[in-house]
Swiss-Prot record:
UniProt subcellular location: Cell membrane; Cell projection, Axon
Example of a GO biological process term: potassium ion transmembrane transport
Modification Phosphoserine, positions: S122, S600
Intramembrane residue spans: 513-524, 525-532
Residue segments, region Disordered: 24-145, 630-654
Name listed for the protein in its UniProt record: Potassium voltage-gated channel subfamily A member 4
A single MF term (Gene Ontology): voltage-gated monoatomic ion channel activity involved in regulation of presynaptic membrane potential
One CC-aspect GO term: plasma membrane
Keyword field: Cell membrane, Cell projection, Glycoprotein, Ion channel, Ion transport, Membrane, Phosphoprotein, Potassium, Potassium channel, Potassium transport, Transmembrane, Transmembrane helix, Transport, Voltage-gated channel
Amino acid sequence: MEVAMVSAESSGCNSHMPYGYAAQARARERERLAHSRAAAAAAVAAATAAVEGTGGSGGGPHHHHQTRGAYSSHDPQGSRGSRRRRRQRTEKKKLHHRQSSFPHCSDLMPSGSEEKILRELSEEEEDEEEEEEEEEEGRFYYSEEDHGDGCSYTDLLPQDDGGGGGYSSVRYSDCCERVVINVSGLRFETQMKTLAQFPETLLGDPEKRTQYFDPLRNEYFFDRNRPSFDAILYYYQSGGRLKRPVNVPFDIFTEEVKFYQLGEEALLKFREDEGFVREEEDRALPENEFKKQIWLLFEYPESSSPARGIAIVSVLVILISIVIFCLETLPEFRDDRDLIMALSAGGHSRLLNDTSAPHLENSGHTIFNDPFFIVETVCIVWFSFEFVVRCFACPSQALFFKNIMNIIDIVSILPYFITLGTDLAQQQGGGNGQQQQAMSFAILRIIRLVRVFRIFKLSRHSKGLQILGHTLRASMRELGLLIFFLFIGVILFSSAVYFAEADEPTTHFQSIPDAFWWAVVTMTTVGYGDMKPITVGGKIVGSLCAIAGVLTIALPVPVIVSNFNYFYHRETENEEQTQLTQNAVSCPYLPSNLLKKFRSSTSSSLGDKSEYLEMEEGVKESLCGKEEKCQGKGDESETDKNNCSNAKAVETDV
C-alpha cells in the first residue's frame, strides 16, 4: 500500500484529483455555455436588426411579429435533445482522454466516481438551460393578429407610453391574473377578468381603482365596511346579482354600493328586491336658459335665496287660506255669511222674519265685499300666478299635468272660480226658482269643502310630508294587506256578535251592518263605548275581536316603520354620503408616474428586485419633496406638519 502511495505521489497524482478535476471541468463547461449563449444572442440581435431594416418600407411591425413567431415556432424538445446528445459524446471523449492521460490514477479512483460527477454536472446544466428556455418562452409577446378578432381590450395590458394610456400587445394569461383587495385589513383575492365584467364600476375600471393602489404591498386598499364587501365581490363573481348581507344595515350597504359605483340600475334593482318601489322622479331642466331660471325659482327652493323667499311666501299664503277656510265656519261668521249668500242669491222671501236681514240688505253687504271673500281672492290670485308660471317654464307639459302635486293645485283653485261663476249667475237670474237656488247653495258648500286639499300644497315645501308620501307609496302592499285583514275581521266578528246578541231585547246590534261600526272600533282598539255587547256570548266575541285586531295591525306596521326610517335617513344623510364618496382619496405621497408604472405591471407581485428598488427610489423622491416643502414654509398648518411626519414614517417603512 505504501509502494502504491509513493508511486502515485511520484507520478504527480493526487488522491483527491477526481474531485478537483470535476470542479475544473464544471468551470470550463460554464465558460463554454456562456460563450455559446452570447453567440446565440448576437445572432438573434443581428437577425432582428436585419428584419427591422428590410421592413421599413411597409408592414414593418407585422413582419416583426411574423419573425418573432418563427423563432418561437421551432420545436423546443428537438433542440434540447440534440444538444443533450452532443454533450454526451463530448463527455465520453473527455473521459477517454483523461483515462489515457492518467493510467496510474485508475487504481486510486473509486469506480465510476468521475463519470457520476460528470453526469450530475450535465444534469444540472440541462436543468438550468431548460429553466432559461422556459423563461424565454414566458417572455414571448403575442400580437393581436396571432389570436384573431377574439382579442379584446380587456385582454390587453395597459401601458404607459407617455401619451396617457393605451394598451400594449401583451395578452393576459387567459385573463387569469390575480389581484389582491384589502378592505380594512381583510384581504380578498380574485381574478382580473372577474372585475373586468363591469368596466364602469370602481373596481372594474383600471383608471378609477388606481388611486387606491398600494405599491408597497402590491394590493388595492379600501378603508370601507368589511362585511359589505362580501356582497360587492359576489356581485362581480355572479355577473350582476346584488344581495345585502343579513348583518349589514340597509343604509350602510346602500352607501357601499354607491361608493363602489355599481350603477343606478343595480341600486334600483337591489331596492326592488328589498321591497321598495322604483322612484320615477323627473329631474330634467328646460333647455331655454330663461325658463330654466324660472323653473328653479318656483320648483326647487334650495337652489337659491330668491327661490327660498318665494317658497316662504307660498307657504304663508297657503296657511292664510287654510285659516280663512276654518274661521268662516264659526257660528258668528257663518250666520252672516249664509245671509249674505242668500241675499246674493235673491232669497228675500226666506229672510222676511229675520231681524238681521233688513240690516244686512240696507248696509249693501254682498258676497263680493265680504272680508273672507276678499282674502280668499288674494290667495287665489297668488295660486293662479304660481301655477301659470310653473306651467309655462316646465320641461314637459305632459309630465307636468301627470304630477300629483300639480293636480292638487288645480283642485284647490277650481272651487273659487266655480263659486264665483255660480254667484254671478244667481244675481243675473233675479231670484227666480227657490228650489234651484237651494240646490246651488248646497253644491257651493260641497265645492268649498274641496278647498281643504290646499293643505297638501304644503308638501311641496315640507320634507316631512314628502317622506310620509314616499312611505305610503312604498308601503301600498302592506297597507292593502292591513285593509284586507280588517275587512275579513269586521265581517266575521260583526256577524258573530249579531247572532250572539240576537235574543237580547235591549241589544245595540239590530243588524249585521249596524255591527260594522262596533267591529271596526274594537279591532282598532279605540272603543268609543256607544255600542257594546251585553250577553256573555257577545262579550266573548268582543274579546276575541280585540285580540284579533291587535295581531292584525301589529303584523304590517313594522314594515311601514322600516320604510319610513329608510326614506327619512336618505333625505337627511344624502349630502353627507355624497361628501364621503367624493372625499375618499388615495395616498397623496405616491407620484402619478409611479402609479402608472404599477398599473401597467403584468405581475401580481413585485417579483423583480430592480422594479422594487426603482419603486423605493420614486417613493423616497416624492417624500423628500414633501419634506422640503414642509421645511421651507415657516407658517405651515397643523395638517401640513402631520403630513410631513407621516411622510417620514412612510419613508422609514420603505
